[in-house]
């Protein structure tokens, strides 16, 4: 009802106006004209964008019959008005020529859709030439140009049937402008743009002289059927060609990209869901429940039926029974390893100074390679594999098109400014956000101009570098001025001119007069960025001062839909050319960027209360990573000091205050740290000799990691030496050797396992991680070798000092009186013996422990299935980095994602008709062509991650060739048959490149090669908006046979418009390539970037398969997507299976080494493996809960976790395996007491202090992936090593080795015989049940230790 009432009111107003107006059109009858012929220029107009056509003369006369050339011209321009030889019309031949000229601009945009172009031409042909013109045209204003001349028509009304107008508009509403990736109607609807355009607004713009293109004012009235205007007026209601219908046998229908009705049915793709289901539950959860249930049943059986206690009743193996071959092999392994390290330790301890010198020499020689160290700081070189597909694609793209330009960007908000309401004369009431305020825009303009004129001194060039030396200038790349530089901001809508920004004017619209200012112009340009002259009284252009349009998503952000006035952020972007590494211009660009950053910091401080400013330069990410690395070096140094202090204090065995300085181990601890650092420096130097580049991350992390691992071995070795009682008459060197023989096999097991894991971690293709793994692996090996040599020598010297009661550090000083050293067992050992071990191994506790760890394993498995994969670039930055705010604003306010180029390689012939049709998306092209498939993908952005279709040089080239004002030839003179630019106004340029055809325009092979270079060099302008210089000059390269080649050959400055490729150009022939640019939707995190890459590659593979079917296409031809971020996120496409493979690969040698060094004990190896797997699973599960994503950095930590887990489990497992206690429970208790305390003090407590210090690091990468993850690994390793492992060993641990038990019994009997012989009145009490200091194992004879020492049992029994 309301709509009907409104229409009635409008009709009443129209009738009233007709009654009051002067009747210039007195006759409204069929066969009569309203005007005829031309009367000159419109005297009311000035300042038009181009030379306007003449206006018609008032003439209310009958239509004329036209003949001859006039009729031919009518048939050519207005074919629908041609009715044969008796055709009548209301236009002269001059009017037809003018009509053709005025339609040429619009036809250039609409010609890709023949039905739209025909409907548009037909509409204006009827207005100008219809024989029934007076029926729907009513002249409303005329001008008298001179005495005796007919009045000139300067305004009229056109009456259309509403359906006729709607159908005409609908046929054009989807036609695209490929180069701008926008709709053509966006340039033909004024302030409303494509989003708010409709038939009425589309027609109104065409009749508005304010647009600088219309020669007179036309008021369009759209009437519904049955609505009568009176005075004989009948609305025009001609037939309209539908865009999906052909207009003849040779005329193609509009393509899907330009006509929705032409699109085939495309099913919405299903969202990718990697979750598999079993019934209604996720399959992973079902499998986890089943697995945990099986484990729970096994646990219940173990506890309920007391498997272990039942077997505990069996006593020690009867020595009289024989031993199996496997028992003998296991025993021999223990014996050989123990004897070797015992003899080695004795020898080294006997020659400490010599060994130290011999150890220092190779370390210094290898460390000298550090002088050749080259640090890599480029993030691409650090975090992407050089041989990866993405790096190869990047190299291919950069080789042929140059590196992607360097972005320097500023994002500003004004959180303290309130929004306000503005009544726009054009669009009505609009809400403007606080950032869109004039004083803020003036501040931004001042900043932009200061940055534009920024200069910086270059020592290398010995001159000042300005923006014009390095900027990206798409429309004038060869002779760039400061105002050719690509700067995108809202201020470009005013050509960065303060006067234009402050300009105001009064304007009357629909009887309402109001003042218009910058806000109206902004609204106009945001809706129609391709406008050369807005429709306001300001009459300003929307084009940037460098000549290109500025789309709203490049200038503002934070708006919803098309409500541009509600934007919450202003965006300013300076685009610089990028250059290959080593190019001096790259250093100049970085110098300018450094000055840019300084200027922005000053602006940020100055405008703190007005703006919230975020910014970045292309160099920012690399600078910030390097900055935080340097700032975190003291944190790592503190971590080393903390570990050193702990080792120094904890290694000492203190019995009284007076002996503290003697019993302290500061020198030994410092020596141990020096051994680790020497190993690290030697490893780094070795790889520097090989030319393998290092990084600051390696300098930070490798010493810390190896120090943690090395400190474990140092602590366990010294602790074993202190706890192992010296035998009567045993020399110090033999004592040290005996201690080393007891722990060195497990030290070898840990070091070898860790080194193997690190070397296997080097299989990752990421350079930073690969070099880190190689360096760490070699450092661990060198550290073990130095511990077996240099540190043993240091321990020998320190023991000699302590035995002589000399002070630590100041070894030359000897106190006068000192009490004898105490023999206490220590608090930790007492706690483990009296409290911890009895409680842990109680039968109730053991069952609870198994169930709790089983539940932990199940929860971790489930959490592991939900871990986030990827590495957000924000995590590479310190917490105080200014880039964090920039990335936050980028994700919050940017309305479009990164550009993605679909690149074609060698082997495709673009010059053939089939080749063009398989690429383009206009009329006559394949429904599933290259660009059409990309268009289909943009319809489903949630699955394809594409938001804006690809710009297509093939489409714009075809449109450029279509007979219009674009491609013209000189018809005479010295330039005959050469290209005549559209900017040349000459009668000598009337020849079109292509002849008029009814079908789709396709050049021949010869024409293709001749005209394409002209197209690529043609600068777009209002007469020819299809010129390819700005959009495609660096995207297309051709060989003489139509295949694409390097741009240098085609766009060489020496190449003129000759129509042929000169001989010298062929010298530049390189690999063929071309590219088509689309845009991603906004990508917020690592997962979005990864999935966007996956989707783009799937789309490119699909396109490749279709294009290979085009005749003449090379089978090796390929299309691939390229985005600058691909090199960082490609690894996450396959990191899950690769990580599982790598971790599984690490477990295999770890298991093998464990079995071998544990005396070929398969069960011990399996229990080690089970514990390590549980530690890994629990670690990954807690990673998901603590927000640690899974990526290459965390993967290498998980690889090292395999090695670190060996530290927690192997010592206790070996202690259990070589124990000869009668029952599993007793052996588990003994291993927990003797070695568990050493693992806690030596492994966990040497890791934790250093790890906790890392929590203070500024770099989030260090905090998350080294502090959090290593803390998890250490705590979970500690829990599994000291809680789960003793319990599971007490149930299913390996049996006592009969050979080991037999040998121990023989040794005990021999000792007893010696004791009886030497002390017959004091019978020996030989027992091993109460020993808590050392493990039970067999040791071979030691020469020089005395006869008794050769037969003493290895349980440390004192006599």
Curated annotation (Swiss-Prot):
Induction: Expression is decreased in Caco-2 cells upon PPARD activation. Disulfide bonds join 33-90, 39-57, 78-125, 91-129, 113-254, 116-172, 189-197, 243-259, 256-263, 471-485, 525-542, 920-925, 966-1024, 980-989. Highly glycosylated. Glycans are attached at residues 54, 132, 138, 244, 416, 431, 464, 479, 497, 506, 626. GO terms for molecular function: cholesterol binding; myosin V binding; protein homodimerization activity; small GTPase binding; vitamin E binding. It is found in: Apical cell membrane; Cell membrane; Cytoplasmic vesicle membrane. Residues 632-797 form the SSD domain. Residues 22-284, 373-632, 688-696, 764-776, 868-1139, 1190-1191, 1258-1268 are extracellular. Plays a major role in cholesterol homeostasis. Critical for the uptake of cholesterol across the plasma membrane of the intestinal enterocyte. Involved in plant sterol absorption, it transports sitosterol, although at lower rates than cholesterol. Is the direct molecular target of ezetimibe, a drug that inhibits cholesterol absorption and is approved for the treatment of hypercholesterolemia. May have a function in the transport of multiple lipids and their homeostasis, thereby influencing lipid metabolism regulation. May be involved in caveolin trafficking from the plasma membrane. This is NPC1-like intracellular cholesterol transporter 1.
């Amino acid at each position: 009802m309301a709509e009907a009432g409104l229409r009635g009111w409008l009709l009443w107003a129209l009738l009233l106006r007709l009654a009051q107006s002067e009747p210039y059109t007195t006759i409204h009858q069929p066969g009569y004209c309203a005007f005829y012929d031309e009367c000159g220029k419109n005297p009311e107009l000035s300042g038009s964008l181009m030379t306007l056509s003449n206006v018609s003369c008032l003439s209310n006369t009958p239509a004329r019959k036209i003949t001859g050339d006039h009729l031919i011209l009518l048939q050519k321009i207005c074919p629908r008005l041609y009715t044969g030889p008796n055709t009548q019309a209301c236009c002269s031949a001059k009017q037809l020529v003018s009509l053709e000229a005025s339609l040429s601009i619009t036809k250039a945009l609409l010609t890709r859709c023949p039905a739209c172009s025909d409907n548009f031409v037909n509409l204006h042909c009827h207005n100008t030439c219809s024989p029934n013109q007076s029926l729907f045209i009513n002249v409303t204003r005329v001008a008298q140009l001179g005495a005796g001349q007919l009045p000139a028509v300067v305004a009229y009304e056109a009456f259309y049937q509403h359906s006729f107008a709607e159908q005409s508009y609908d046929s054009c509403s989807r036609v695209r402008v490929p180069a701008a990736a926008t709709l053509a109607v966006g340039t033909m609807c004024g302030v409303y743009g494509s989003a708010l355009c409709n038939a009425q607004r589309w027609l109104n713009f065409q009749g508005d002289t304010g647009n600088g293109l219309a020669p007179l004012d036309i008021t369009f009235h759209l009437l519904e059927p049955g609505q009568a205007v009176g005075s004989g007026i009948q609305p025009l209601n001609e037939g309209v060609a539908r865009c999906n219908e052909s207009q003849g046998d040779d005329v193609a229908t509009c393509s899907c990209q330009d006509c929705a009705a032409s699109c085939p049915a495309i099913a919405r793709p299903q969202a990718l869901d990697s979750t598999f289901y079993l019934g209604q539950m996720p399959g992973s959860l079902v499998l986890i429940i089943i697995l945990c249930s099986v484990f729970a049943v096994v646990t219940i059986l173990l506890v309920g039926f007391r498997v272990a206690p039942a077997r505990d009743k069996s006593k020690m193996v009867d020595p009289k029974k024989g031993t199996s071959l496997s028992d003998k092999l296991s025993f021999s392994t223990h014996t050989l390893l123990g004897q070797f390290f015992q003899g080695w330790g004795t020898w080294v301890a006997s020659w400490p100074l010599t060994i130290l010198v011999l150890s220092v020499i190779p370390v210094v020689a290898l460390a000298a390679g550090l002088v050749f160290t080259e640090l890599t700081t480029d993030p691409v070189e650090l975090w992407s594999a050089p041989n990866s597909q993405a790096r190869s694609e990047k190299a291919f793209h950069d080789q042929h098109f140059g590196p992607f330009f360097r972005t320097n960007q500023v994002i500003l908000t004004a959180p303290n400014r309130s929004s306000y309401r503005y009544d726009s004369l054009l669009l009505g009431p609009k809400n403007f956000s606080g950032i869109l305020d004039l004083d803020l825009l003036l501040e931004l303009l001042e900043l932009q101009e200061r940055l534009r004129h920024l200069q910086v001194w270059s020592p290398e060039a010995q001159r000042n570098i300005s923006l014009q030396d390095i900027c990206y200038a798409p429309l004038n790349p060869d002779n760039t001025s400061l105002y050719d530089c690509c700067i995108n901001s809202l201020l470009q809508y005013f050509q960065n001119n303060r006067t234009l920004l402050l300009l105001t004017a009064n304007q009357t619209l629909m009887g309402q007069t109001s003042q218009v200012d910058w806000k109206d112009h902004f609204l106009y340009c945001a809706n129609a960025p391709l406008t050369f002259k807005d429709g306001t009284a300001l009459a300003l252009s929307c084009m940037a001062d460098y000549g290109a349009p500025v789309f709203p998503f490049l200038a503002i952000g934070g708006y919803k839909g098309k409500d541009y006035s509600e934007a919450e952020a202003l965006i300013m972007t300076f685009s610089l050319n990028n250059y290959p590494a080593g190019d001096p211009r790259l250093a100049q660009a970085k110098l300018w960027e450094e000055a840019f950053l300084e200027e922005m910091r000053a602006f940020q401080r100055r405008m703190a209360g007005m703006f919230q400013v975020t910014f970045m330069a292309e160099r920012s990410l690399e600078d910030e990573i390097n900055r935080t690395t340097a700032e975190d070096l003291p944190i790592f140094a503190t971590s080393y000091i903390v570990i050193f202090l702990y080792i120094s204090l904890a290694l000492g065995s203190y019995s009284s205050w007076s002996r503290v300085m003697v019993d302290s181990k500061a020198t030994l601890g410092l020596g141990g740290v020096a051994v680790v650092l020497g190993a690290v420096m030697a490893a780094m130097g070795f790889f520097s000799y090989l030319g393998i580049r290092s990084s600051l991350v390696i300098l930070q992390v490798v010493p810390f990691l190896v120090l943690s691992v090395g400190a474990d071995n140092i602590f366990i070795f010294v602790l074993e030496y202190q706890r192992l009682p010296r035998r009567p008459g045993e020399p110090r060197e033999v004592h040290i050797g005996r201690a080393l023989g007891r722990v060195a096999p497990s030290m070898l097991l840990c070091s070898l396992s860790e080194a193997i894991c690190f070397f296997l971690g080097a299989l990752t293709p990421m350079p930073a991680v690969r070099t880190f793994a190689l360096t760490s692996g070699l450092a661990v090996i060198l550290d073990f070798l130095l511990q077996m040599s240099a540190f043993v020598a240091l321990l020998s010297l320190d023991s000699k000092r302590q035995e002589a009661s000399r002070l630590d550090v100041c070894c030359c000083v000897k106190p006068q009186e000192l009490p004898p050293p105490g023999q206490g067992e220590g608090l930790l050992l007492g706690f483990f013996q009296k409290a911890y071990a009895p409680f842990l191994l109680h039968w109730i506790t053991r069952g609870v422990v198994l169930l709790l760890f089983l539940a932990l394993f199940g929860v971790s498995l489930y959490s592991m299935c939900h871990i986030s994969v990827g590495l957000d670039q924000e995590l590479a930055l310190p917490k105080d980095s200014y880039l964090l705010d920039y990335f936050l604003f980028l994700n919050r306010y940017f309305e479009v994602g990164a550009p993605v180029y679909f690149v074609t390689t060698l082997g495709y012939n673009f010059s053939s008709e089939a080749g063009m049709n398989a690429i383009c998306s206009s009329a006559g092209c394949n429904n599933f062509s290259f660009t059409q498939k990309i268009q289909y993908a943009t319809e489903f952005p949630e699955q394809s991650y594409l938001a804006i279709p690809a710009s297509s040089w093939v489409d714009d080239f075809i449109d450029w060739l279509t007979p219009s004002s674009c491609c013209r030839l000189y018809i005479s003179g010295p330039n005959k048959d050469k290209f005549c630019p559209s900017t040349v106004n000459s009668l000598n340029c009337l020849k079109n490149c292509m002849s008029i055809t009814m079908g789709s325009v396709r050049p021949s092979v010869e024409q293709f090669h001749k005209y394409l270079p002209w197209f690529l060099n043609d600068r777009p302008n209002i007469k020819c908006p299809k010129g390819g210089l700005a959009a495609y000059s660096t995207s297309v390269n051709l060989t003489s046979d139509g295949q694409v080649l390097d741009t240098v050959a085609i766009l060489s400055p020496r190449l003129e418009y000759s129509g042929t490729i000169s001989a010298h150009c062929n010298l530049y022939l390189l690999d063929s390539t071309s590219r088509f640019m689309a845009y991603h939707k906004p990508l917020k995190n690592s997962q979005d970037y990864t999935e966007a890459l996956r989707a783009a590659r799937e789309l490119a593979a699909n396109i490749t398969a279709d294009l290979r079917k085009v005749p003449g296409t090379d089978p090796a031809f390929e299309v691939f997507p390229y985005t600058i971020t691909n090199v960082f996120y490609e690894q996450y496409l396959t990191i899950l299976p690769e990580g599982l493979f790598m971790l599984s690969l690490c477990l295999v040698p770890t298991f093998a080494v464990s079995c071998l060094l544990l005396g070929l004990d398969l069960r011990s190896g399996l229990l080690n493996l089970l514990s390590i797997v549980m530690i890994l699973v629990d670690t990954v599960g807690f990673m998901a809960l603590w927000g640690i994503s899974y990526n290459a950095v965390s993967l290498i930590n998980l690889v090292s976790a395999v090695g670190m887990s060996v530290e927690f489990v192997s010592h206790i497992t070996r202690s259990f395996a070589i124990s000869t206690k009668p029952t599993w429970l007793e052996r588990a208790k003994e291993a927990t007491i003797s070695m568990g305390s050493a693992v806690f003090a030596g492994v966990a407590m040497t890791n934790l202090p250093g790890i906790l210090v890392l929590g203070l690091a500024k770099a989030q990468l260090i905090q998350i992936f080294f502090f959090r993850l290593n803390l998890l690994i250490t705590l979970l390793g500690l829990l599994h090593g000291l809680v789960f492992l003793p319990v599971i060993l007490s149930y299913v641990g390996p049996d006592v080795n009969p050979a080991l038990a037999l040998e121990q019994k023989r040794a005990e009997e021999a000792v007893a015989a010696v004791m009886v012989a030497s002390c017959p009145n004091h019978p020996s009490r030989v027992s091993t049940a109460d020993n808590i200091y050392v493990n039970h194992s067999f040791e071979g004879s030691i020469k020089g230790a005395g006869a008794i020492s050769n037969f003493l049992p290895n349980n440390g029994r004192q006599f």
